[in-house]
Amino acid sequence: MKYVYLFSEGNKDMRNLLGGKGANLAEMTKLGLPVPQGFTITTEACTRYYEDGEKINDEIQTEIFENIKKMEEITGKKFGDKENPLLVSVRSGARASMPGMMDTILNLGLNEDVVEVLAKKSGNARWAWDCYRRFIQMYSDVVMEVGKKYFETLIDEMKKKKGVTLDVELTADDLKELAEEFKAEYKSKVGSDFPTDPTEQLMGAVKAVFRSWDNPRANVYRRDNDIPYSWGTAVNVQMMAFGNMGDTSGTGVAFTRDPATGEKHLMGEFLMNAQGEDVVAGVRTPQPIDHLKDVMPEVYDEFVGICKKLEEHYHDMQDMEFTIEDKHLYMLQTRNGKRTAKAALKIACDLVDEGMITDKEAVMMIDPRNLDTLLHPAFDTEALKNAEEIGKGLAASPGAAAGEIVFTAEDAKTAKANGKKVVLVRLETSPEDIEGMKASEGILTVRGGMTSHAAVVARGMGTCCVSGCQEIIMDEENKTFTLGCKTFREFDEISIDGSTGKIYAGLIPKVDASITGEFGRIMAWADKYRRLRVRTNADTPKDALKARELGAEGIGLCRTEHMFFEKDRIAAIREMICSDTVEERENALAKIEPMQQKDFEALYEAMEDYSVTIRYLDPPLHEFVPTEEADIKLLAETQGKSVEQIKAIIAGLHEFNPMMGHRGCRLAVTFPEIAKMQTRAVIKAAIAVSKRKNIKIVPEIMIPLVGEVKELKYVKNIVCQTADEVLKKENFEMEYHVGTMIEIPRAALTADEIAKEADFFSFGTNDLTQMTFGFSRDDAGKFLGSYYDKKIYENDPFAKLDQKGVGKLVKMAATLGREANPDIHLGICGEHGGDPSSVEFCHNVGLDYVSCSPYRVPIARLAAAQAAIKAEN
């Protein structure tokens, strides 16, 4: 097996083996673009590294050094040589883009001897020592895990001592002194001298990149973005191009279109006399890319030509990294750029209009999960008129955020856990902050541009971000910042607008986003290709109308118990629970029936002639009884019972495992009068709206938690008998369907029997997951973190359908059900109905529809189209 490929040996179709970065470096080499040469160590080598107990075996090491020899032949330089040294960068490059998630080392191959020779030969001692101190810092941080902060402190102390504010103002002698301090810091932390042998440095760096595939921030990012652990990362070893050689050198990052809006213009930033990490890390605030034409017009023109060539070649917006070494341009990377959902839609539609791609390709270009961000609120325009604007940064990631100020990622996580909405304010963010960024409504940074870590990650997560607000004077130690003559402390309130970059004092109210234009076009294309229908889970007319606006084709799950918790209804439910006889229960239920009917009428009106599936009462009765002493006393008074009697009734409802207890169809078996009341309400509501609106309604009644066909038979008989009585009394003809949720493993295993009694199955994957795994959704959070760390699970099975186990049950039940009843309709109504990978699974096993929460309807529509296109290909 071949583990190492020169850039000249690969191409863009080898990304599974070479990773995205390696495949694209190979492709740019093939296109004849100026790429510093090098080689890629494959993802299979990474997998092998972990299989061999985190060791790089002799076979792979031999290949690495064979390719170092080939690089020496290409460049005319020699690795480890004092007189003509070959210096390299070592970078990660996974199959899927993971910006800032893994680690990079620059200037590898330097030591005391080499740096002295470089200083003499180049006549630029400052550059040579700057490269060396950077290398010591990166190697210490990435390979030996000595935190960056120790070195940053030494830099700050040196700048203070020399009376300068910027790194670039330090002289060669200052940097030489700093390099010595760095090595002393390394020795004090590691216990040995900084390595001088380039071979040792290289192998240490390669191992570190492989290790970084498994670091906590990469694991979090992978889970959030459906990137399997088994993929591994490739490693790219590339000849250094130096952007820090002086005023005719620089480095930058650019996009062929605006990643925030999708507008067709070159957007990016560059820094003179800097290395690539300076731009991405956001340590210095760079200049806009179009200023490059004033500084180096020829280099700018060459770069613009390359950008055009790359976009036309890849048929997508490109995100590129480049370095200028003494007026020579080098391309270090290209990839399909991360973009906001709004930009993704515009870019896809524009590329179709420009004739570059088809509508089918446009549908496949968009990550369905990102659509979520389009549907998020913006600030109320009237409220904005009176808002107090205190400053402005860069509009790094669109959206509106308002909340209490926190200064650390840890504080953001804690606040979120306590139900608070927060805005994370940082000098700059780093990959370690990712969990805190996820927990925040928005992110505000003092440093960094549109391509800084904060900006890129926030855009990917759909979180509002304002970056590079340099007017902020930050005091991290005391957790305060000053902006616009005002000092803000921890937990003070601010609002930030990621679409304009504006920052406001206080909380500004938000309004729902309105969706038009490109969104409609993409959704129309998606609807053209998808086979699965998309319904919504909705219990209120407001939710139902929102879902219809977003393209829902019916309600796949209406949870009737949610209607019982309103103040006027809970009293009647409690009266029913406390009743001693069937008559008393029926009297209590008679009070609820007109309320339920009214609720159902509102849903039927909202959905018109689309299907509405109504699930009968599901939760255990203990959820409806009071727990506070005052409420118990009040219930006793209204029921004409003593407090002790009520407490005895409540105690009698206690169950050791209520989620597997007296709930679902078991309630209807024990108290048939509940099912009768709900049936009357469903049918009467359907009749009333059919007459009023002159539409055909076919009610769908769903019996929950069936595990035995006889349960369904028993409850179905009650439903049909009651429905027929109502229809006869009203002298009205109406078709209605009775089906069940498949949410108990036994129901899936005996689906052929159950299908004979059911008009439809709806897979309740929340409970089916709980019962198949044998753990509770509410308690799993306590241990799932350890399971992720130990690679037992890669994803939360309640968020992403477990296709091996739970999925096998779904597939089996679908097959058995269809064999027994070819006319049966099959759907899914758990939270998984809005997860793209789960939607694809539903398409592949032949379900008829998925049902999800209103705001996830567009996600499901697009995911269903992508599933159909993939299956066709």
Identify the role of each PLM range.
Residues M1-A387, T414-K416, K420-V423, S430-E435, ...:
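Nucleotide/phosphate-binding sheet-loop regions of phosphoryl- and nucleotidyl-transfer enzymes
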Residues V206, L375-F407, R521-D527, R531-T536, ...:
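Flexible inter-domain linker/hinge segments
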Residues R91-S92, I515, W525-N873:
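Conserved alpha/beta-domain cores
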Residues N236, V406, V423-V425, L444, ...:
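Structural motif
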Residues K392-E432, L483-R521:
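Extended, non-globular alpha-helical segments
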Residues F39, V446-G448, S467-Q470, C558, ...:
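Short beta->alpha connector loops at strand-helix junctions that form conserved
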Residues H328-Y330, L427-K438, G442-L444, M450-V457, ...:
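Glycine-rich phosphate/ribose-binding loops and adjacent secondary-structure elements
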